[in-house]
A protein has these predicted regions:
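"Short basic amphipathic alpha-helical interaction patches in structured regions
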Residues: 93-100, 115-123
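Acidic-leaning, charged glycine-interspersed low-complexity segments
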Residues: 118-148
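Residue-level marker of positions within ordered structural domains that often coincide
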Residues: 86, 107, 132
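Short linear functional motifs in flexible/disordered or boundary regions
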Residues: 93, 106, 114, 139-140
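Small/polar-rich, solvent-exposed N-terminal microdomains that initiate assembly or binding
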Residues: 1-92
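Oligomerization/assembly interface segments of phage tail-like spikes and tubes
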Residues: 94-110, 127
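Short, flexible/disordered intra-domain loops and linkers
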Residues: 7-8, 111-119
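Eukaryotic short linear interaction motifs
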Residues: 89, 109-112
Length: 148
């Protein structure tokens, strides 16, 4: 039976799930990024690479796509990925521009790394390196807008 007047949903909001997949896959391929999240010590970057199982556990514990943290007895570093400020694209109104936010949350006791490095800024540097001027599912590239 043919359904008359059915249109496949055309919403740029549907690209969020694909963008999340691209972002989290890139994060799970970056060993420096994973070490900074997994190991709480000052020498986190000198530690062994994570196994596939440890990497996948980061997505459950440290990398969040829902902005909710659970309070438990372990002290972890977190990355919360969120999408906000959707506006019509000036050049192509079928697309929406939006802001992708990466909230970096680290316990103060875990900020200090070796050689005057600070964990939140090293995580920010890795995120910047992975995604600056990269293309996701939309028509443009990611551009750094700022940090708080």
């Amino acid at each position: 039976m043919k359904i008359i007047n059915y249109q496949f949903p055309k919403s740029s909001f549907l690209s969020v799930e694909k963008d999340l997949e691209i972002i989290t896959n890139a994060m799970l391929k970056n060993q420096r990024f994973k070490k900074l999240l997994h190991y709480n010590s000052e020498d986190a970057l000198d530690k062994p690479d994570l196994t596939q199982k440890e990497s996948l556990e980061l997505f459950k514990k440290n990398i969040k796509i829902v902005p909710k943290l659970y309070i438990d007895h372990s002290v972890l570093s977190y990355i919360i990925i969120s999408f906000d400020n959707f506006t019509p694209n000036a050049e192509n109104p079928e697309f929406r521009d939006n802001i992708i936010s990466f909230d970096i949350i680290c316990h103060f006791d875990q900020w200090q790394l070796k050689d005057f490095q600070l964990r939140p800024y090293r995580l920010a540097a890795e995120i910047d390196t992975m995604f600056e001027n990269k293309h996701l599912t939309g028509i443009g590239t990611l551009q750094f807008l700022g940090a708080n």
